[in-house]
Amino acid sequence: MAFSCFDKFSYTYCYQCMHGPDGCMVPSRNGEGTELYAHSEELEAKLRELARRGHMEIEKELALEKKTYGSHIKILILGGPLSGKSTIFKQMQIIHVDGFKTDQELIQYRGLIDNNIRDIYLQLIAGSRVVGIPLDPIEHITYEIDEIYAPMSDAFSVRTISELLEPLTEFWNSKQIQEIYKRRCEFELLDSTKYYLENLTRIADPTYLPNQEDIVHSRKATMSINSIVFEYTGVSLLMIDVGGQRSERKKWLHLFDDAKVVLFVIDLTGYAKRSEESRMELSRFPKFFRDVGSNAYDMKVALKIFNEVAAASALANAVFLLFFNKVDLFKEILSQVNLQPCFSKFDGENTYEETSKYICEKFIRAASSKKSVFPHFTTATNTENVKLVFRACMESVFKANAKATGLS
């Protein structure tokens, strides 16, 4: 079956724990019950039946998919916690497919952005307690905001953000919140905080519908495996985002043994953040507090994941693309947080040039010398930057494939 760059492919897989609470995406502790189903109305009945079968049946189903889409170059997106995997995926939809343009999509993302802004507010409030900056001087503002937010449910149907424009703007511009924001690495805070709060006047307009940049900045925990097909320079690519599949990778990674490319995304600011990967994106709401004392640095977690993925026999023949993401935020944080606490052997200057080089070398060394690894630095929220970096990546992939097949 042939696809062109004008075809929109939205066949979505999801691996779900059959033992966890309320449809939790965390695999069960005894390692049993990982089932496969597809979010598609047409296939719902078929895949309900599939969910009752075992792993052998699942693999047979995937084998059929491989035959159907065997002509595509399969690109698997993996990475560390909150690294921007889904942002890259959205950019591919914008650049190479048809983006997000339907009324239904725009209204859904508008609701998500409203929720993101509420989460940002709550995270900043929680952050004040973490960093020890009291909010007494702006208590009247937070009281007004709380009064408006209090009746809201998760899926509020009536937009009230226009009522919040004035108090939220005053809240964001306050001395206390700006000081808390400077110390954002010490607590959980959405990367889109500054972007959304500085665009609040536009977003709060009653006629507002998000543009593509607004959508790229939006944040929603990825609980499923999403895929798109698009053409690039005459070659058909199948890109798969495995963002929500956190634990026990060895149990599902072999299902993608025909992937030609692994696009591994790393959050450069992760050197300054501590987290626990297994709980990072699996809770209903963002985690407002970080337990700094007991968790590893995000970047150390990402390095461990990359080492595991690079050593996986299922991906032995894949080309690895390293996307060192959030360059813009990384440069900001470098002036406040040194690299050495995360990497004790780093003895260079805390400049962008020296720190980025050191981090890049750490990841390259984590892969076998026989691996084809191509590092790239990017800002995933910048569409033009992603477009240029992806072009450079695919040139590397095509050259590596030509070399492997003796065509170069």
UniProtKB/Swiss-Prot annotation:
Location of the region described as G1 motif in the Swiss-Prot/TrEMBL record: 74-87
Gene Ontology molecular function terms on file: G protein-coupled receptor binding; G-protein beta/gamma-subunit complex binding; GTP binding; GTPase activity; metal ion binding
Gene: gpa-14
Purpose of the protein: Guanine nucleotide-binding proteins (G proteins) are involved as modulators or transducers in various transmembrane signaling systems. In association with the G-protein coupled dopamine receptor dop-2, modulates two types of learning: touch habituation and chemosensory associative conditioning.
The organism of origin for this protein: Caenorhabditis elegans
Location of region: G4 motif: 321-328
Gene Ontology annotations of biological process type: adenylate cyclase-modulating G protein-coupled receptor signaling pathway
Residue ranges of the TM segments: none
Assembly and binders: G proteins are composed of 3 units; alpha, beta and gamma. The alpha chain contains the guanine nucleotide binding site. Interacts with the dopamine receptor dop-2 (via C-terminus); the interaction is direct.
Residues reported to bind GTP: 39-46, 79-86, 201-205, 216-222, 241-245, 285-288, 325-328, 380
Name assigned to this protein: Guanine nucleotide-binding protein alpha-14 subunit
Source domain of life: Eukaryota
Family: Belongs to the G-alpha family.
Signal peptide: none
Region (G3 motif): 237-246
Occurrences of domain G-alpha (ranges): 71-408
Keywords attached to this entry: GTP-binding, Magnesium, Metal-binding, Nucleotide-binding, Transducer
Pfam families (alphabetical): G-alpha
GO cellular component: cytoplasm; heterotrimeric G-protein complex
Binding, Mg(2+): 86, 222
Disulfide-bond pairs as recorded: none
Region G5 motif, residue ranges: 378-383
Chain intervals for the UniProt region annotation (G2 motif): 214-222
